[in-house]
């Protein structure tokens, strides 16, 4: 009887591991079907108690694996651009820009996961799937991300994604009007505006 129970437990574990692997592979395959796209997005941030913290909107351009432009237009403008080597963050309100090497960018943030679609990044998560909905839980609790969920169709269209931080704060993004076309190369280049302070961390 004990041998039967042990065998059942082992089989259950193998099936569970296989399901997680299949979910991760399916998610990567779906995202991999679209290498370049543009979409509008809306953002809603809520506290752990469910209180609204911020609502915003913007535009997103992606050309995988390493080019993207995340342009937040409201409530405050900010821009995050990758030119393939450098990651630029620009805040017009404070007239400051930060430059870091893209290769040093962490893979445990939702945006980097979506844009890079790097197999090494996905290995850091347990992935569960229910239809077009994927739920990701970090294997390590050392980071700030507690849970990440994304809805993506079989053809690679991202409908929404949500990130929950360790303190319970939830950031939900809804994407609309995704167009799978190649963006102009200028979208992935950043020129430091006159009078803007640069914090260059590429040392």
Curated annotation (Swiss-Prot):
Pfam families assigned to the protein according to its UniProt record, in alphabetical order: LolA (PF03548)
Coiled coil feature spans: none
Localization: Periplasm
SUPFAM superfamilies: Prokaryotic lipoproteins and lipoprotein localization factors
Recorded GO CC terms: outer membrane-bounded periplasmic space
Signal peptide per UniProt: 1-21
Keywords for the protein's UniProt record, in alphabetical order: Chaperone, Periplasm, Protein transport, Signal, Transport
Top-level division of the source organism's lineage: Bacteria
One GO process term, biological-process aspect: lipoprotein transport
InterPro entries given in the database record: LolA/LolB/LppX, OM_lipoprot_carrier_LolA-like, OM_lipoprot_carrier_LolA_Pbac
Main location: periplasm
Sequence similarity: Belongs to the LolA family.
Task of the protein: Participates in the translocation of lipoproteins from the inner membrane to the outer membrane. Only forms a complex with a lipoprotein if the residue after the N-terminal Cys is not an aspartate (The Asp acts as a targeting signal to indicate that the lipoprotein should stay in the inner membrane).
Record's subunit section: Monomer.
PANTHER family attached to this UniProt entry: OUTER-MEMBRANE LIPOPROTEIN CARRIER PROTEIN (PTHR35869:SF1)
The name this protein goes by in its record: Outer-membrane lipoprotein carrier protein
Source species of the chain: Yersinia enterocolitica serotype O:8 / biotype 1B (strain NCTC 13174 / 8081)
Encoding gene per record: lolA
